[in-house]
Amino acid sequence: MFGAIAKALFGSANDRYIKSLRRIVEKVNSFEPSVSALDDDGLARQTVLFRERLAKGETLDQLLPEAFATVREASKRTLGQRHYDVQIIGGIVLHRGEIAEMRTGEGKTLVATLACYLNALEGKGVHVVTVNDYLAKRDAEQMGQVYRFLGLTVGVVMPNISDEERRQAYLADITYATNNELGFDYLRDNMKYTREQMVQRPFNYAIIDEVDSILIDEARTPLIISGPTDDKSDLYIAIDQVVKKLGSDDYEIDEKQKNVVLTEEGTERAEQFLKADGLLPEGNLYDFENTQIVHHLNQALRANLMFRRDVDYLVRNNKVVIIDEFTGRMMDGRRWSEGLHQAIEAKEGVQIEPENQTLASITFQNYFRLYPRIAGMTGTAATEATEFHQIYKMNVVTIPTNLPVQRKDENDQFYKNLEDKFRAIAKSIKEHAASGQPILVGTVSIEKSELLSEYLRHEGVPHKVLNARYHEMEAHIVAQAGRLGAVTIATNMAGRGTDIQLGGNADFRIADELREMTEGPERDAAIIRIKKEVAEEKQKVLDAGGLFVLGTERHESRRIDNQLRGRSGRQGDPGLSRFYLSLDDDLLRIFGSQTMFAKMMNKSLADGEAIVSPIMSKAIETAQRKVEARNYDIRKQVVEYDDVMNDQRKVIYEQRATVMDAESVNDLVEEMREDTIADLVSETCPEDQYVEQWDIDQLKEKALDLLNLDLPVKEWQEEEGIDSEIIAERILEKSDELLAERSKDIPPEQWAGIQKNTLLQAIDHHWKEHLSVLDSLRQIIHLRAYAQQTPINEYKHEAFALFERMLISIREDVTRNLSRIELFQPSFELSELPEFFKNSPEIMAALEEQEKLLFETTVDGQNQPQDDQITVNQMAAQQGAAAQTDSLSDADPAHWVGKISRNAPCPCGSGKRYKHCHGAFDSKN
């Protein structure tokens, strides 16, 4: 009560903060006359002057008023848009690294130009992060006009562009990209072998558009770069068939946790089916050796009973594609982990892709915390202000609207069941559409959107459906959703980032209708006509009440509901919003108090009749708060566990960077070898043991394995006065001699390259294995709670021990591989190659690279390429053969392999022996 009185008297903390920023806005406005008086060249020269002032010691904060005035003027001249005072406030908030909550239609994209320009003056790069590629490209093109006018460079990172194009985009003053592209480029960069191959430069400042979507909604989904593992398709199919034989009494479903567990009877039946199919040996399903079978069985249960087609995923082109639960968009390239995706593929009978092993991963929480400064923009962030502050240390500032909001938000309407609700929705849509009022209908899934579409077809109401099936025209459909009488059904926040303009979007109409028309007076007249029609149609829509937003269901998060409401009433336009709910809705069914709702519904409520109750609306909000709190706990837990991996990731990535930047890693490699020898001797010949107790057999075996040395350790053991220190010195001396012999014919710069690549390969290999082990540990660590232990503390302890073990393995691998380096001399000259090899740039480049290195790693005397990589000779032979696949004949060189004596003349007529001509590659293949 006292808080409400204080707020009424003094205003909220947000109001007071906004008031303090208005003084800076006045300074910006004071520069407007002088900046407006500059000609185009003078305005563009401002950038040079600002950078000179920065170099002399001025700060960005000191430059802010004049820089913002410069951007405002450049925007007027290039886009015809002048920043409002409230947009200047938004720019200040972004520059300060805070989150600007701005209502839909208030011009967030334009606001970003202020902070982008100011922070780009330092020349360290600014990243503008968007939720999809369309918005990245659109904003880079539109706002790029302002930046280029002022002499700044603009880049945009799109899928499928080359590394060189990415590198140039990141070198630009301002770079537009999606959160996924940025994150994956970071992971890929940290798998490269030279600095020159990397595409990103050091992070500086980022503005995240739709920050709640990226840092909240996607926070539970880590970015993962993975590689394939063994194919287990038959196992997935067999276990899926077992699950399909189970009945409803065999399992219990927990919809809140999206989990399924077998009952006692279900376990017995599952065991019978698994044994009958030969998947389970004699014994209990939950015996230790059956852990993998239990895991796959659990995933198959979840796939069949918890994940719904056209709700959680859809099947497109014989592939299972995940549907984003918050946006309703398809998430191409994303796959559920831990075998769940494969279980769903088995359920749907589509091709089962192999499981993947994690090569590198990071969450968005930890990726964006790599930036020294980040800021964010969104229409809805206040409900998550606590989370933004606790995890990202960012304050949420609500920016006032330029004009008062005139949208009317009506109370929720409750119906007994889904059928009554959809009938009422269809009737309401028909009535409002008849008056010319445009309607945006929000649904939670493809399934519901298509069900409602059937009801509207039955009522004869023309409409458009926008969901993951029809996503290609998303921006166009949403942009025209404000036309007179338009009815648009959209899943969740499809089209986010595209304004719904009343009367339609003139630019989209011009692009669509005048696509075939060439420049000239006729086209100019058509543009004027379209703009006039749009203005007239807008007035009719305003007279009809503006955009009507109709929600068919409450989302788990109040924020998503607020986003849907926010599509209406932009820039002071009138509007209407209303939600229709029923007892069958997931939120009420899973999280709400159904008993209370059912009692209120049954009180003299006829079929098809609605009830409007503040008590029920409050109960809905309570249910949403419960879900939000649960989801926040999940995200917080994800951060806690990923922070453990993040600390280790930083160490590994910093180590890689140090190795790549070093001219020579010889000292580091020598230190690793010495430590490996010291550990070996300490393990087998402890100082506190008698010589007779030493494990000489293990010492001999490990010296051969790690150092490629066959040592007379038994003779050493029998010497008078021998001790572990002498043993270590002798082993190091022998190892030095071996390496000196191995490297004597290799030029120093090439030996340095060999050492560096060997070290990087070892780091990457063991980091990959370490990630896999941490994944497994993460899945089972919660069981420690049953032993009265704190899972996160146990995870930290064990992860640290595993990390130390990994560092030792890296050290041993580097020592082992460098001890086996051998010089490999090719049996041919490049000039002697046959023509069909010379015509392949890939083969020639590979062979030239081999000529430079002239070495190959061997193990136990057998040439074996590491990590399943083919040797250069094999690659040349394979590519040469592949190039000839379409035209093989007896006269073809590819048919001569194995049929001609190596010392016989080559059939090609060169006059050389076969082994020095076309047979040069037969020796290896």
From Swiss-Prot:
Its EC number is 7.4.2.8. The keyword Transferase does not apply. One of its GO terms (molecular function) is metal ion binding. One of its GO terms (cellular component) is cytosol. Belongs to the SecA family. This is Protein translocase subunit SecA. Pfam families: P-loop_SecA, SEC-C, SecA_DEAD, SecA_PP_bind, SecA_SW. It is an enzyme of class 7 (translocase). May bind 1 zinc ion per subunit. InterPro entries: Helicase_ATP-bd, Helicase_C-like, P-loop_NTPase, SEC_C_motif, SecA, SecA_CS, SecA_DEAD, SecA_motor_DEAD. Zn(2+) binds at residues 906, 908, 917-918. Its cofactor is Zn(2+). Keywords: ATP-binding, Cell inner membrane, Cell membrane, Cytoplasm, Membrane, Metal-binding, Nucleotide-binding, Protein transport, Translocase, Translocation, Transport, Zinc. The keyword Lipid metabolism does not apply. Part of the Sec protein translocase complex. Interacts with the SecYEG preprotein conducting channel. Has a central role in coupling the hydrolysis of ATP to the transfer of proteins into and across the cell membrane, serving both as a receptor for the preprotein-SecB complex and as an ATP-driven molecular motor driving the stepwise translocation of polypeptide chains across the membrane. Its main location: membrane. It is found in: Cell inner membrane; Cytoplasm. It catalyses: ATP + H2O + cellular proteinSide 1 = ADP + phosphate + cellular proteinSide 2. It is a peripheral membrane protein. PANTHER family: CHLOROPLAST PROTEIN-TRANSPORTING ATPASE, SECA INNER MEMBRANE COMPONENT OF SEC PROTEIN SECRETION SYSTEM. NCBIfam families: PRK12904.1 (NF009538), secA (TIGR00963).
